[in-house]
């Protein structure tokens, strides 16, 4: 005789498995008050994350404590309003910042760029932890990191100009991702082989969703280190390099 089928989980049980807004219920033709207030709060947190200040000095001190020579630069975006209205300015170095890079160590394997992006709070919360886990992994395979560059008003492509100025074979950009309603502090890592102005997203690999409820700093560093090593060996990133790093995460229990 066959054993009885396992009953399906209730919607309430499913809700505990995801921060996504599912099975919220209703009150008449609208949402219940609790769900509506929760949505409003999440939206406010996402907006605050975009407009939060970026403490480049604090990030610089944290990276220097890890033994990394660290420089500070800015994009051509004069302020946050400029940054949001003119994405193109966030992809270009401000002239005096270019002069800062001209005096830095050249011809390195990897240049690390930490940029505020669209969520400075994500950078403050996650970036140093990712770097802390990443450095020994790169050192273990004899991949050198020259300097870390902390960039204010940064878009992802700013790393291309920074990497080119440093003569780096590859650039790794850790940057705040666009805040979501369930993840206002998510960090992304973008890797580009042969960085230079004019490259597109097709030339990059991305490790995204790095935050407390997503990919951990250790897991992200594992993936980044694998992509860096393989990218340098194959002399390619982006669509030419598939992430086959595997996972450090434990397997989910079988139902």
Curated annotation (Swiss-Prot):
Catalyzes the deamination of various vicinal amino-alcohols to oxo compounds. Allows this organism to utilize ethanolamine as the sole source of nitrogen and carbon in the presence of external vitamin B12. Pathway: Amine and polyamine degradation; ethanolamine degradation. Adenosylcob(III)alamin binds at residues 156, 177, 206. The basic unit is a heterodimer which dimerizes to form tetramers. The heterotetramers trimerize; 6 large subunits form a core ring with 6 small subunits projecting outwards. Pfam families: EutC. Transmembrane segments: none annotated. Binds between the large and small subunits. GO terms for molecular function: cobalamin binding; ethanolamine ammonia-lyase activity. It comes from Rhodopseudomonas palustris (strain TIE-1). One of its GO terms (biological process) is ethanolamine catabolic process. It catalyses: ethanolamine = acetaldehyde + NH4(+). PANTHER family: ETHANOLAMINE AMMONIA-LYASE LIGHT CHAIN, ETHANOLAMINE AMMONIA-LYASE SMALL SUBUNIT. Belongs to the EutC family. This is Ethanolamine ammonia-lyase small subunit. Its cofactor is adenosylcob(III)alamin. HAMAP family: EutC (MF_00601). Keywords: Bacterial microcompartment, Cobalamin, Cobalt, Lyase. InterPro entries: EutC, EutC_C, EutC_N. GO terms for cellular component: ethanolamine ammonia-lyase complex; ethanolamine degradation polyhedral organelle. It is found in: Bacterial microcompartment. Its EC number is 4.3.1.7.
């Amino acid at each position: 005789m066959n054993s009885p089928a396992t009953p399906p989980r209730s919607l309430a049980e499913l809700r505990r498995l995801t921060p996504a807004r599912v099975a919220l219920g209703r009150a008449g033709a609208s949402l219940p008050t609790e769900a509506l207030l929760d949505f409003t709060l999440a939206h406010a947190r996402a907006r605050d994350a975009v407009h939060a200040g970026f403490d480049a000095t604090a990030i610089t001190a944290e990276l220097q404590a890890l033994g990394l020579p660290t420089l500070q630069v800015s994009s051509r975006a004069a302020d946050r309003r400029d940054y949001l209205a003119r994405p193109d300015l966030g992809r270009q170095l401000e002239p005096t910042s270019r002069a800062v890079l001209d005096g830095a160590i050249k011809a390195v394997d990897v240049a690390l760029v930490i940029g505020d992006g669209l969520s400075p709070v994500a950078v403050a919360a996650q970036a140093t932890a990712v770097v802390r886990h990443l450095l020994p992994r790169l050192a273990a395979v004899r991949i050198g990191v020259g300097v870390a560059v902390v960039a204010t008003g940064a878009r992802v492509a700013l790393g291309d100009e920074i990497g080119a100025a440093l003569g780096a074979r590859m650039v790794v950009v850790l940057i705040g991702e666009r805040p979501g309603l369930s993840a206002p502090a998510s960090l992304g890592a973008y890797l580009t082989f042969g960085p230079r102005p004019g490259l597109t997203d097709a030339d990059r690999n991305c490790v995204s969703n790095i935050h407390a409820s997503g990919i951990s700093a250790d897991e992200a560093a594992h993936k980044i280190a694998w992509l860096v090593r393989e990218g340098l060996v194959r002399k390619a990133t982006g669509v030419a390099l598939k992430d086959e790093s595997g996972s450090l995460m434990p397997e989910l229990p079988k139902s």
